[in-house]
Amino acid sequence: MAEAAAQYRHKEKRRGRIKKSERRAQILLELKLHPHVRISELARRFDASTETLRRDLDALAKDGLIDRAHGGASAPSQGHYPTLDQRNAARSEERERIAQLAAAQVRDGETIMIDSGSTTIQLARFLAYRGVTCKVITNSLPVAMTLGHGAAEVMLCPGEYLPDESAVVGPETLEFLSQFHVDRCIIGASGISDEGVSETVRGFAAVKKEMLRRASRRQLLVGSEKFGKDGLARVTRLDGLDTVVTDARPDGSLLRALSKSGVEIVVAEPSGDQKA
């Protein structure tokens, strides 16, 4: 991987200055190889001004892709946030129930936005298995690839690629999403409480917000282990949702807040029965 990065830099240096999006993608690659990068070193490598690189790092930090540090940046600490592979291995039975029930609600001919996440990957699998002829816009590579084996027409967003999440985020992703209006969006989240829906990674929170803005019907797929939890970035208030599909009915303040906000709660029971 280090050799590939070196070859990439050498090739781009011969061709001249690279595009902003390519430069930022390369910065993310550098942080996969090294725990810390300095602005002065990046400026030398990319033959760009330190002010340009400072703006790059500020933008990546704003999207939650890196941690800003004095004179440079470091890879974001992910000890508190499991990778996509780790999340896929956890609570798989509950996640499949949620995804299967959500997939059953999708109709042929619908236009849908689906975000990245372990549960939405399972949703894509069930949609492909059913052969639903919908049109899907997604920022998730696994979702796009899975639906590509079915009857769906798929558009994959551009943006900054996150290898651990197999997804794209950033300004280009948001600009792409802003061009469309869809029948429904289906998103996941890191947490849901009476304060609203939240996400640990700010870049993902921004994508979810834009998808919610662009949809007539807004659905959240969330496991009961995330009830009462608040992530770093707010995605929406509860009244920004139409439906929550989950594996267990919430109680207490969360249930009261959802009811007050008029959110439909659909529970995927172990037997496969639906409870509203």
Please state what every model-predicted region is.
Residues T119-L123, F227-D230:
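Short glycine/serine/threonine-rich phosphate/pyrophosphate-binding segments
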Residues A2-L42, D47, E51, K62, ...:
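Conserved phosphate- and dinucleotide-binding cores of soluble alpha/beta proteins
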